[in-house]
Amino acid sequence: MHVSTFQALMLMLAFGSFIIALLTYIKKK
């Protein structure tokens, strides 16, 4: 199973944005 660079980049971007959203949610509490 080969993962293209574009797919890996999109996965990292989605994961990063999820982490940022989680951190901002915790800070707002």
Curated annotation (Swiss-Prot):
It is a single-pass membrane protein. This is Probable small toxic protein BsrH. GO terms for cellular component: plasma membrane. It is found in: Cell membrane. Its main location: membrane. It comes from the Bacteria. It holds the Pfam family Hol_Tox. Possible toxic component of a type I toxin-antitoxin (TA) system; an overlapping antisense RNA has been identified. Encoded in the skin prophage. Keywords: Cell membrane, Membrane, Toxin-antitoxin system, Transmembrane, Transmembrane helix. The chain crosses the membrane at residues 6-26. Induction: Accumulates by 2 hours post-innoculation and into stationary phase in rich media. It comes from Bacillus subtilis (strain 168).
